[in-house]
């Protein structure tokens, strides 16, 4: 018989650095999930990834206090900042430019994020990534 799902929890955790301190510990603890078990499993799963990369994770927890988790790709903003080599986006996106990014870089990001985006094809995914870039104050070139 299948386990009965008690709920789902969405978190964004840095790769390889899940620990029981806030915000992870309290979020899992109040739902009765074994915090250390999650931290060990998550850190093992993200061992090969770039340390500190923000990873969205969806945790499904069951009534018997067990859990499973699904990791997604890092946010588009993380990829954009990394490709444009900037620390943060523009505080006034319409007026001040934070940097620039090429269409080829946008295509690379769209291909990496394709399975997480709600897009039918690569052009749709590129349009979404391009919109995110503009809202961060990045100039799209080429």
UniProtKB/Swiss-Prot annotation:
<comment type="similarity">
    <text>Belongs to the universal ribosomal protein uL11 family.</text>
</comment>
<keyword id="KW-0488">Methylation</keyword>
<comment type="subunit">
    <text>Part of the ribosomal stalk of the 50S ribosomal subunit. Interacts with L10 and the large rRNA to form the base of the stalk. L10 forms an elongated spine to which L12 dimers bind in a sequential fashion forming a multimeric L10(L12)X complex.</text>
</comment>
<dbReference type="InterPro" id="IPR006519">
    <property type="entry name" value="Ribosomal_uL11_bac-typ"/>
</dbReference>
<keyword id="KW-0687">Ribonucleoprotein</keyword>
<protein>
    <recommendedName>
        <fullName>Large ribosomal subunit protein uL11</fullName>
    </recommendedName>
</protein>
<dbReference type="Pfam" id="PF00298">
    <property type="entry name" value="Ribosomal_L11"/>
</dbReference>
<comment type="function">
    <text>Forms part of the ribosomal stalk which helps the ribosome interact with GTP-bound translation factors.</text>
</comment>
<keyword id="KW-0699">rRNA-binding</keyword>
<dbReference type="GO" id="GO:0070180">
    <property type="term" value="F:large ribosomal subunit rRNA binding"/>
</dbReference>
<dbReference type="InterPro" id="IPR020783">
    <property type="entry name" value="Ribosomal_uL11_C"/>
</dbReference>
<dbReference type="InterPro" id="IPR036769">
    <property type="entry name" value="Ribosomal_uL11_C_sf"/>
</dbReference>
<dbReference type="GO" id="GO:0022625">
    <property type="term" value="C:cytosolic large ribosomal subunit"/>
</dbReference>
<dbReference type="Pfam" id="PF03946">
    <property type="entry name" value="Ribosomal_L11_N"/>
</dbReference>
<dbReference type="GO" id="GO:0003735">
    <property type="term" value="F:structural constituent of ribosome"/>
</dbReference>
<dbReference type="GO" id="GO:0006412">
    <property type="term" value="P:translation"/>
</dbReference>
<dbReference type="InterPro" id="IPR000911">
    <property type="entry name" value="Ribosomal_uL11"/>
</dbReference>
<keyword id="KW-0694">RNA-binding</keyword>
<keyword id="KW-0689">Ribosomal protein</keyword>
<dbReference type="InterPro" id="IPR020784">
    <property type="entry name" value="Ribosomal_uL11_N"/>
</dbReference>
<dbReference type="InterPro" id="IPR036796">
    <property type="entry name" value="Ribosomal_uL11_N_sf"/>
</dbReference>
